[in-house]
Swiss-Prot record:
<keyword id="KW-0274">FAD</keyword>
<dbReference type="GO" id="GO:0008718">
    <property type="term" value="F:D-amino-acid dehydrogenase activity"/>
</dbReference>
<dbReference type="GO" id="GO:0005737">
    <property type="term" value="C:cytoplasm"/>
</dbReference>
<keyword id="KW-0560">Oxidoreductase</keyword>
<feature type="binding site">
    <location>
        <begin position="3"/>
        <end position="17"/>
    </location>
    <ligand>
        <name>FAD</name>
    </ligand>
</feature>
<dbReference type="InterPro" id="IPR036188">
    <property type="entry name" value="FAD/NAD-bd_sf"/>
</dbReference>
<dbReference type="GO" id="GO:0055130">
    <property type="term" value="P:D-alanine catabolic process"/>
</dbReference>
<dbReference type="InterPro" id="IPR023080">
    <property type="entry name" value="DadA"/>
</dbReference>
<comment type="similarity">
    <text>Belongs to the DadA oxidoreductase family.</text>
</comment>
<comment type="function">
    <text>Oxidative deamination of D-amino acids.</text>
</comment>
<dbReference type="GO" id="GO:0005886">
    <property type="term" value="C:plasma membrane"/>
</dbReference>
<dbReference type="Pfam" id="PF01266">
    <property type="entry name" value="DAO"/>
</dbReference>
<comment type="pathway">
    <text>Amino-acid degradation; D-alanine degradation; NH(3) and pyruvate from D-alanine: step 1/1.</text>
</comment>
<keyword id="KW-0285">Flavoprotein</keyword>
<protein>
    <recommendedName>
        <fullName>D-amino acid dehydrogenase</fullName>
        <ecNumber>1.4.99.-</ecNumber>
    </recommendedName>
</protein>
<dbReference type="InterPro" id="IPR006076">
    <property type="entry name" value="FAD-dep_OxRdtase"/>
</dbReference>
Length: 428
């Protein structure tokens, strides 16, 4: 089968790779000059299935109000003048209940755990290298309230059989030796030893090369204008004056997926702006060995070979990609507070990206009401974590195979109108 994949971020490239492995003739189209040059370029670098969780959580609405007045707040909201933004925020608020959080986190962990398994199999099969580490993830708590609040996450981890360790301040140094110097600032930590880290952009570039070796064609610097419709099916992709035709089409355009298919269906994928800095390591003993999550600031600090990546925060501000100096200040403050002297933040590069987020946190992967159109988008802050599993899942669906995990609750159908014409709730 001929398949066109739109988008060459980590999700699009993973989709292409697994489709090619399944025997399909695949073409990837992207407006950029190469793979992973937008949202996948400088993300936090963590592959954290156990920490796969929706931003829509109990207590978040009240926290959001408090964060409005804090200098280093992890969340910021600025109205962009669109009705879509208001609708999306309302849908997100409706998911901020304990019941919805448990459902959403459960299916996110399911896909993320499967994706980690797919990544491990890929690594064993191909030997792909991307400055990856398998040292786990450590979530740090600065208050007793944060530590107590981890109970709901631990319950989900236990239900999903995800191994974890609850550490006291004195035990944190066993996972991250450099934290011994700052343990007095912390009340404890939750460690997931099965989590991994790695450079997403490097991984995507090398996976694209592997995909090319399987026959995948990459068409970069190519405009993606619209989908041509005929007889209720996709008849082609309009790329400037050219129409590219295939048997099936995959939209993996991140935050831009929403507007691209708006004439066919309405999907609630909104750009959640995040930031990162990447600093050279100057003192190995003072640097992290894997990934640390600061629960207070919602910031991830990740170790690559000779670099530290610090990323996080969320701004609901539309498609604004301006770099705000205050956000860099927050990232530098966080890493220097936990790992003083580990990296030289004065020499750090500064980046921002738009994560494609759904109101319930769960991505949209699978079939659509248009028989030959498939979606692989809406992964939010977990595109790197979920990429391989989403790609394999999509390849199975297109190939007519039964997926290895439950997939019906990941599709776009949870957002579309039912047979009675009623819109299904965004928390379905």
């Amino acid at each position: 089968m001929r398949v066109v994949v739109l988008g060459s971020g980590v999700v699009g490239v993973a989709s292409a790779y697994y489709l090619a492995r399944a025997g399909h003739e695949v073409t990837v189209i992207d407006r950029e000059a190469g793979p992973a040059l937008e949202t996948s370029f400088a993300n936090a670098g963590q592959i954290s299935p156990g920490y796969a969780a929706p931003w829509a959580a109990p207590g978040v609405p009240l926290k959001a109000v408090k964060w409005m007045f804090e200098k280093h707040a992890p969340l910021a909201i600025r109205l962009d003048g669109t009705r879509f933004q208001l609708q999306w925020m309302w849908q997100m608020l409706r998911n901020c209940t304990a019941d919805r959080y448990a459902v959403n986190k459960g299916r996110m962990v399911r896909l993320a755990e499967y994706s980690r398994d797919c990544l491990q199999a890929l690594r064993a099969d191909t030997g792909i290298q991307y400055e990856g580490r398998t040292g786990g993830t450590l979530q740090l708590f600065r208050t007793q309230q944060q530590l107590d609040g981890a109970a709901k996450d631990i319950a989900v981890l236990q239900e999903a059989n995800v191994p974890f360790e609850l550490l006291s301040p004195a035990e944190l140094k066993n996972a991250e030796p450099a934290l011994a110097a700052v343990s007095h600032k912390l009340t404890g930590g939750l460690r997931l030893p099965g989590d991994e880290t790695g450079d997403c952009q490097l991984f995507t570039t090398r996976l694209a090369a592997l995909a090319e070796s399987l026959g995948v064609k990459f068409r970069y610097n190519t405009p993606i204008d619209s989908l041509a419709i005929a007889g209720g099916r996709i008849a082609g992709v309009q790329c400037g004056s050219e129409t590219v035709r295939a048997d099936a089409y995959v939209v993996a355009l991140g935050s831009y997926s929403t507007s691209f298919i708006s004439n066919l269906m309405k999907i609630p994928v909104y750009p959640l702006k995040g930031y990162s800095i990447t600093a050279p390591i100057v003192n190995d003993a003072a640097a992290p060995v894997s990934t640390v999550l600061d629960e207070t600031y919602k910031i991830a600090i990740t170790r690559f070979d000779q670099r530290i990546r610090v990323g996080g925060m969320a701004e609901i501000v539309g498609f604004d990609k301006n770099l705000r100096a205050a956000r860099r200040e927050t990232l530098e403050m966080c890493v220097n507070d936990l790992f003083p002297g580990g990296g030289d933040t004065s020499k750090a590069t500064f980046w921002t990206g738009l994560r494609p987020m759904t109101p319930d946190g769960t991505p949209i992967v699978g079939r659509t009401p248009v028989s030959n159109l498939f979606l692989n988008t809406g992964h939010g802050t977990l595109g790197w974590t979920m990429s391989c599993g989403s790609g394999q899942l999509l390849a199975d669906l297109i190939s007519g195979k039964k997926p290895a995990i439950q997939a019906d609750d990941l599709s776009v159908h949870r957002y579309l109108k039912d047979v009675a014409g009623q819109t299904r709730p965004a928390y379905a």
